[in-house]
Amino acid sequence: MHYPSKNKVRMLLVAASMFLLAAGGLQNANADVKQENAVNAERVQKGKVLFSENCQVCHQEGGAGKPGVAPSLTNKELLSAASDRFLLDTIRDGRPDTAMPTFGQLLKDEEIQAIVSYLRSFGTEPVKGGMLDNDRKAMGDPRLGARWFSQVCAGCHGVNGEGYEGSGSGTAIGKSGFLGKASDGFIRYIIKNGRSNTPMRGFAGPTGMANLNEQEIDDIITYLRVLQK
């Protein structure tokens, strides 16, 4: 009878040990994923309850929004373009001079994060917020931007971007509460793509409402920054 050499036995034992270690590592990884998913699901459910208690009265069930009252918070464009920081800071600080109050003294940080996790659960596209926040600064002519804003934006957002206070159906994009948190990349993305489930439609390309080109969009953003100042 032929017996395997000591080296072969040693190699077989090493291979078996490596297999058992890999299997154990895979089991641990699967357990970690399951635990993380459970934590995330719990956070989303907590956020849903907090949203119902604090946000739903204006933003409606499921964050669908209502024109003239509060914008949709669960449309795919916003959830793709907005960074977590944008959402967290907006909930915490509110939007001064609008109906959006500050929740920073009412809710704990982890509760605000839970609301953001709940909103994120509606997302259907990759989150580009971080990339957009690092996008180039708008370099435009505010005088031309004022003209474009008057022609294509003021009808909904108000003459000076005052939003609902100007009896418009759009939000107050000319006030510091928005402009202080929104990057040029974020604004550019929303102008191009619009926000579904709201009156805001995309303005770029041949199918856009105004077919604005890159420079014209930058002109509008530059004008908004003048309003911010």
Where would I find each of the regions flagged by the language model?
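N-terminal export/targeting leaders of redox proteins
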Residues: 1-45, 110-113, 117, 121, ...
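The canonical Cys-X-X-Cys-His
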Residues: 47, 51-61, 115, 119, ...
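Extracytoplasmic/secreted proteins, especially bacterial periplasmic and envelope-associated proteins
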Residues: 42, 46, 86, 110, ...
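Residue-level marker of structural boundaries
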Residues: 56, 78, 96, 121-124, ...
